[in-house]
Amino acid sequence: MALSVYYDKDIDLGVIQSLQVGIIGYGTQGEAQALNLRDSKVKVRVGLYQGSLSIPKAKAEGFEVLEVKELVQKSDVIMALLPDELHKEVLEKEVIPFLKEGQIVGFAHGFSVHFNQVSFKKGVGVILVAPKGPGSALREEYLKNKGLYHLIAIEQENSKNNAKAVALSYAKAMGGGRMGVLETSFKEECESDLFGEQAVLCGGLEAVVRMGFETLIKAGYPEELAYFECVHEVKLVADLLHYKGVEGLRKHISNTAEFGAIKAREPMENLLEKRMQKILKKIQNGSFAKDFLLEKSLNYPRLNTERKALKETKIEQVGEILRTPFNHEK
């Protein structure tokens, strides 16, 4: 099923320019979105809790900073750009009680809405505007007169029946219309995003990289060569895949590499298929969300342990040395 795609020519920027936008949070996404919106001549304020370390930065960049509940009362569109696990706590206390019909609450990821962490009264719009990339890339591409792909979705219409128009206009203001704005649903965005992170982009890639590195080390190969072959060159291949696709990647590698990839892929696919299906199932049935929210409630014991342990791994120790020349170049 093909998704509807919208470009700059299809979208009215004036819709969002006529409204007051409030950005809750000033991390990498909050900052990038606020700056892009302002450069697109959209009226923007930032909402932060009293004492937030981000207040000086937001003010230095010229934004009016309000406490969250005041921001909500002075905005037409409120974007919740906080970590997923904080949405329930912050929104139930500082946002939802102060909302009125006609307002719109937006998210950059569908997690808290799809997994029923928050809900909104009738007449309040609930939208998704999700840039397909980190805040740093969102800002960099905008400044180059380019953009990132964006996803939009409407979970709940507002009393003005303009939720979709607002979502599209907001995405255009961030540069999304330069590449393409795709319409989906909170469910599809949330579940596919989590799956991509876990099975491929973060969890899957890290597992393959670390296992490859360890396999060569245990077989007696030099650590430096293991790092170059299994970690460093990932970027070269990823760039080819990004810009040219799978077929294009194949065309840019040797016959030896291509034949070897085909031979190695077949047994790996058999192992991965069932594992990936299990990962997706745990996302779909809410098991992952439950585990993650429990982790947050316990103050992140697993994350803290894993982060500490990672610093002591051989792959990180070798990588820190080999990455130094590249860091110097920057």
UniProtKB/Swiss-Prot annotation:
Substrate binds at S254. NADP(+) binds at Y26, G27, T28, Q29, S52, S54, G135. Mg(2+) 2 binds at D193, E229, E233. Binds 2 magnesium ions per subunit. It catalyses: (2R)-2,3-dihydroxy-3-methylbutanoate + NADP(+) = (2S)-2-acetolactate + NADPH + H(+); (2R,3R)-2,3-dihydroxy-3-methylpentanoate + NADP(+) = (S)-2-ethyl-2-hydroxy-3-oxobutanoate + NADPH + H(+). Residues 3-184 form the KARI N-terminal Rossmann domain. Its cofactor is Mg(2+). Residues 185-329 form the KARI C-terminal knotted domain. GO terms for biological process: isoleucine biosynthetic process; L-valine biosynthetic process. Pathway: Amino-acid biosynthesis; L-isoleucine biosynthesis; L-isoleucine from 2-oxobutanoate: step 2/4; Amino-acid biosynthesis; L-valine biosynthesis; L-valine from pyruvate: step 2/4. InterPro entries: 6-PGluconate_DH-like_C_sf, KARI, KARI_C, KARI_N, KARI_prok, NAD(P)-bd_dom_sf. GO terms for molecular function: ketol-acid reductoisomerase activity; magnesium ion binding; NADP binding. Belongs to the ketol-acid reductoisomerase family. This is Ketol-acid reductoisomerase (NADP(+)). The lineage of its organism: Bacteria, Pseudomonadati, Campylobacterota, Epsilonproteobacteria, Campylobacterales. The gene is ilvC.
